[in-house]
């Protein structure tokens, strides 16, 4: 598992073996309530026996419970721009809005919406054609040769989530890139999607879920993540049923609720001066 570290890189030299030992003691050995054991391709009783033999001796420290260490998240929106030389020379822009988290009813409609928007890069790794009928491919990439990439993005946490669109272009086109993102988001809020693209989005999402779960590596990770987030696991049949239950009206209302919140703007590139100011972007959705 790879985790993104937001701390300053110069602090790496200050880490010592004792720091890692302290971390493991606090969050693993003294906090077994936070542990989830999952497995694929192994019998349930055998897995329970292995977990009991190797982890059964761990004792919970009451002050280490998750309830005592986590504060509720409050979404605020805002902007963050980084003037930084990129390998490709493009400026990357993202605009997103708050939606519900893992435990909300926004989860499945948001996944369908991400499938509908789709998108990708002007260069398709592994062969052309993937996602070419998604909205961002048809309405952004295919109509604007200067767009390097345009893709739906989505992040979920327990209490809140974020959904939006990312795009990249040469620096001088950054303002136009942001406007294209705006137009796509407002279009979703002003009119329902067509039956054809809606049905395609649901089928693509269902196929993606089922295909990924064919891998044992993905399967046991999915079980572990669901146990951590929900305390139980939904099988593929339940997931498919929830996807089929999503309506076009669900997507419309999801986007309308989202854009009522302050936007989140992020940009990174060699020259971010062409990216519109945050207040201007906020007025777009007012």
What are these regions (language model features)?
Residues 106-110, 129, 133, 171-178:
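Short, charged, low-complexity patches
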Residues 32, 41-43, 86, 121-132:
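Short, charged helix-to-loop "capping" segments that act as catalytic/coupling loops
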Residues 95, 105-118:
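Active/ligand-binding-proximal structured segments within catalytic/core domains
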Residues 1-74, 83, 89-94, 99-101, ...:
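Charge-rich, well-structured scaffold segments of protease-associated domains
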Residues 118-146:
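M16/MPP (pitrilysin/insulinase) zinc-metallopeptidase core fold and M16-derived inactive scaffolds
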């Amino acid at each position: 598992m790879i985790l993104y570290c937001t701390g300053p890189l110069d602090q790496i030299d200050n880490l010592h073996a004792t720091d890692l030992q302290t971390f493991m003691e606090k969050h693993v050995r003294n906090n077994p309530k936070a542990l989830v054991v999952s497995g694929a391709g192994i019998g349930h009783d055998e897995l329970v026996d292995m977990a009991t033999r190797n982890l059964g001796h761990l004792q919970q420290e009451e002050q280490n419970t998750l309830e005592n260490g986590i504060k509720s998240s409050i979404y605020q929106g805002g902007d963050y721009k980084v003037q930084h030389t990129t390998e490709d020379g493009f400026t990357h822009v993202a605009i997103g809005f708050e939606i519900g988290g893992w435990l909300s009813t926004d989860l499945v409609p948001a996944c369908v919406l991400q499938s509908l928007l789709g998108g990708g890069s002007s260069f398709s790794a592994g062969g052309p054609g993937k996602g070419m009928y998604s909205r961002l491919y048809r309405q952004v990439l295919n109509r604007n040769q200067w767009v390097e990439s345009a893709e739906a993005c989505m992040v979920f946490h327990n209490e809140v989530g974020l959904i939006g669109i990312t795009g990249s272009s040469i620096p001088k086109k950054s303002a136009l890139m942001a406007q294209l993102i705006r137009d796509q988001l407002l279009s979703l809020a002003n009119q329902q999607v067509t039956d054809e693209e809606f049905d395609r989005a649901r089928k693509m999402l269902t196929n993606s879920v089922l295909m990924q779960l064919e891998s044992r590596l993905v399967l046991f990770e999915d079980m572990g993540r669901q146990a951590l987030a929900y305390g139980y696991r939904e099988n593929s049949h339940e997931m498919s049923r929830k996807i089929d239950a999503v309506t076009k009206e669900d997507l419309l209302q999801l986007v309308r609720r989202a854009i009522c919140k302050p936007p989140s703007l992020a940009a990174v590139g060699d020259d971010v001066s062409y990216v519109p100011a945050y207040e201007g972007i906020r007025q777009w959705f007012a």
